[in-house]
């Protein structure tokens, strides 16, 4: 588990970025596969999720996951939902709830407000980033009472610029919007 030094200062907030090592899955899924929607053996997935929960000290019932769709949909969570929300970011101020997202190439982004005790987890792929999912998550944090000056953010492991080739027309989508991109 990879931890942010920035977030480690806030003892009341547990977090971690997991890689694919040390899981129960095998074959083509040989990893710490937590993708409930994958064709991996469900027993292995549940063992992997249990392992993650033990590491971050939460019950499996309180680990909230999404059906990620590369969108800009952000959900405020106050209790464990009956089924996984369809979107790419979660926000909560409820103690004992853990927010989880799954990534490979996309960027996992955590934003916290330690003063208001509000946390968020964002699955930021290029489509979600283009559709302003991070901005929309910050907006949701502000609606819950956060101030920008109190927010801390970390980006977890994701694909590097060197390994993510794009064509000029793709790049233009982002640079037309903002020359600094």
Predicted ranges, named:
Residues 1-181:
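Active-site microenvironment for binding and transforming phosphate-containing groups
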